[in-house]
Structures are given as C-alpha cells and as structure tokens.
Amino acid sequence: MTPRMGGKLLILTWASTAFTLLGSHAVAQEPRPGVDWPQFRGVSAGGVAEGFEAPVRWNAETGENILWKTPIPGLGHSSPIVWGDLVCVTTADSGQADELKVGLYGDIEPVANDWPQRWEVRCLDKTTGAERWTAVAHQGVAGISRHPKATHANSTLATDGSHLVAMFGSEGLYAYDLETGRELWTVDLGLLESGFFRVPAALWGFAASPIISDDLVVIQADVLNGSFLAVFDVATGDERWRVDRDDVPTWSTPTVHDVDGRAQIVVNGFRHIGGYDLATGEERWRMRGGGDIPTPTPVVADGLIFITNSHGGEAPIFAINEGASGDITPAPGTLSNDHLVWSQRRDGAYMQTPLVYDNLLYNCRTNGVLSVYETRTGRRLYQQRIDGGGSGFTASPIAADGKVYFSSEDGSVYVLKVGPELEVLAENPMGETLMATPALSEGVMYIRTRGHLVAVG
C-alpha cells in the first residue's frame, strides 16, 4: 500500500498554534526499567519488570498484602499504566448496572447499551490510591454495541511521560497532559465498526490500544469497513500518514521495534500480519494469518517476533526473524522458511498476548491450558492446565523476579515459578471479575478488577 501523508483530520481543541503560545512543547522521556509501565503490557508490550522483589501471596477479600483499593465506576477492561507517581485507567460509566458476562461460552449477541455513557480517564496516586485527576473525554450514546464480555473502554492508555493518549474507538482519540489532565487535542476517527466479519451484526466494540514511539501515536484500526493503520503527531494530533489495510476486524494492539536502526510497526491480522516502517508507513514484510479473530499483541524478544491468534479452526504461533522482508507466508504443508524460524499450527492463543521470559515463551489459551516453548527452537517443554478448569483466561500474563502471573476471569491470580516445568507458587483471590492485564512498578502490582483498582505489595 502507498501511505497517504497528512490525511484529513479534525482537531477539536488545542491546535498546534496554541501549543506554541502556551509553551507546551513537552519532551518525551524514556521509561525507567521496573518503574514505568507506559502502555499495554508495559515497555514494548514485553510484560516484564525486573529489579524489584515481586509479590507472591495476597488476598483482596481479607486485605492481606493489599496496599490500597480504590473504586472505579463504570465498566472498563483497559489495563492500568504507570508513570512516575501516577497510575491511570479509562472507564465508560453509564450510571447503570451494566451487564458483563464472563466465563467460557459461545454467545456472540452484542449488548446494545442505548443509554448515555461518560468516557473517562482517571489517574490516581500510585502510592495512596487517591484521585489525582479525572477527565471526561466524551458523553453520549456509544456509536456501536459491545460484546457481552467487553466494555466501551477496552483500549489501554499510552504515555511518553508527558502526553497521555486515550483511544475510545468511535468516540475518538484523545491526548492529555499527564500531570494535570488538561486536554491537549482530540481526533474524530469516524465510526469504527469492530465486529465479527462472518456475522456483521455482531458488533463487539473497539479494543486495540494506542502506542507512542518517536513522538508518534500509532493506531491500528481493523474494522468492517475501511481498515487502516495510521500515525499521529503526539504533540499536535496531526496525522502523519495512513495506509489502508485489506483485513477484517481485529482487536490487536501493534508493537514497535527497531530493525537496523529503523523503527518498525508490527501488526497482527487474519489476512495481513506484517511490518511497516514507522516513519513512512512503507510495508516491509507480510504474511497471511490463521485465526480469524486476531487479538494478541505481537511480542519481540530474543531476536524474534512472536505472533499468535486463534478462532475459526486455526490457532498458529509464529516465530519470525526481526529482519524479515517481503512475503514470508510459508508454503502449504511447511512450518518454516528463511524468515519464519518456526511455527506451530494448533496451539495459538485467542485472547492472551504471549510472554517471553528467561528464554521461554508462555502461551495460554482461554481455557487455562498453558504451553511453554523454547523461544529459539520452538520445542514445547510442557502443556498443562493452570487451574482446575471452569473459568476463562483473558488478561495477558506478566512477569518479574522469577515469577509469571496469570489472571483468570473469575478473579484468581496464579503465580508460577519460571522454568521448564509447571510449578504454581500461589493462587490469590481478588474477589471480583478480572479481565484487564495487571501492571508492575517498583515491585507493586496494580490490578484492575470489575469495580476497583488494587495495589498489591
């Protein structure tokens, strides 16, 4: 595809001239390892925060090892992010007792939610849980319906230490000053119909999160009509480029990594997995996917790009060379080629983003069956169920201090010892539904449940 540079854009507040007059040219900062968790799954979506002792046992029902617990109104599956002394989430609050149906089931009928919502960004003091600021991004009836297991605030925030970016799908893209909550700009992206392409009436809600890299905001919007990948200036909201994508709706957040000194965006997909040059939008490589509802985020580690998806009869895991180029789709009946180091056709994840930790790839299915592979060879070391069955697993794993954390939808957090065999160190109850991926900062875990943000330490 040929990128369209500087595409049409609606800036509703704080135009670029206002930035100049107010002296508001904020400077992006580098995240501090183990301290800052700036986007979905932390730095580069890796999900790892080293350098601090991490918790093993806690109980949110009794208060054991709970530092604070702050109510968050409304519904939201966006994961917490952490920067400096702030921890931030989004929510969509209707003021009603909104339905949320979790667990393992196959119902695809959407929830309409015809009553008005308030789309909010909430930032708390990470030490005390006290509110620092709340911004109302949008008010009104949602542009599209949602899946009964989803919300109208699924996308996780992203920050560069100065700007905070929120993506609310059809309700818009927003940027705030991280410290004050002052709205900087907003972009109307139009109606983004995120739904199952085989049943177009099943609109499930937008979920891909923004990411920030090199002063650019990256948005992947694979939807029923007019899928695209676009980048925006983080300071002004100006669109830098946009490329059309020939793909069906996906719910995956992209990843950015460097290849030979150039930043590259990597995207998951059904018809089109691929890499794009961050600066220009030029396509660098591509391949066809497998599962027809791609959700996991690509992960780059150990010189490889790991991509998985599942649904519709296929469930692949791909391990791709960082420097891949051209069309790398494997020939029929093969599992590797010059760019595809290894692949597995039947073990992919539907919802969870995989985790690479200590040269091991952790890949968990929605039913709680965990498979662990050697990253370089693709040799599977074990495949076992984490729990006794019955609960779904949607939140993605994170890791720290030799431990890997898996969260179930019924509100249990399982702590595993890293290694070639399954060893469960603890099962910790949260007392509420748990769909969002936790965050880690300075040895404290921040867990977003249905009704609260909880600090564990």
What are the language-model segments listed below?
Residues 1, 19-29:
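Short, charged low-complexity linear motifs
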Residues 1-8:
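N-terminal secretory signal peptides that target proteins for export/translocation
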Residues 8-23:
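Bacterial N-terminal signal peptides
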Residues 25-457:
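Noncatalytic, solvent-exposed loop/strand surfaces
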